Amino acid sequence: MRIALCSYSQKEKETALLMKLGKVDRFDNGVFCTYAMQRDGPYDAVVVMEDGARGMNFCMSIRGYSRDVPLLWISDQAEFEPQSRRMQADTFLVM
């Protein structure tokens, strides 16, 4: 399984958990993730671990390139749930 983790800040616990699932590539922004998908092919899943507008921008970059890749947005701001639907995130989790 090939997973893209988009997170500006390093969250070691979450990253370690995801790395157990398979190959994880970490990106500081959605644009770099999009470049990697163009260069190396699609990911099995993209996980955005950013809050608020930054997370929304990550999702916009990913969805601008691919509507098919499963997209999980993890945030601590529940008020961004409507934006997650608009960005067509497959799952929005509040932690």
Where are these regions (language model features)?
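Hydrophobic/aromatic residues located in beta-strands of well-ordered beta-sheets
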Residues: 3, 71-72
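Two-component/phosphorelay signaling modules centered on CheY-like receiver
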Residues: 5-32
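Conserved active-site segment of CheY-like receiver
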Residues: 7-8, 73-78
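Short, charged/polar "capping" segments at the starts of alpha-helices
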Residues: 10-16, 53-55, 79-83
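Short, structured coil segments at secondary-structure junctions
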Residues: 20, 67, 87-88
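Conserved phosphotransfer microenvironments
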Residues: 33-34, 42-66, 77-78
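Two-component signal transduction core modules
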Residues: 46, 71, 92-94
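Alpha4 helix (beta4-alpha4-beta5 surface) of REC/receiver domains from two-component response regulators
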Residues: 57, 76-93
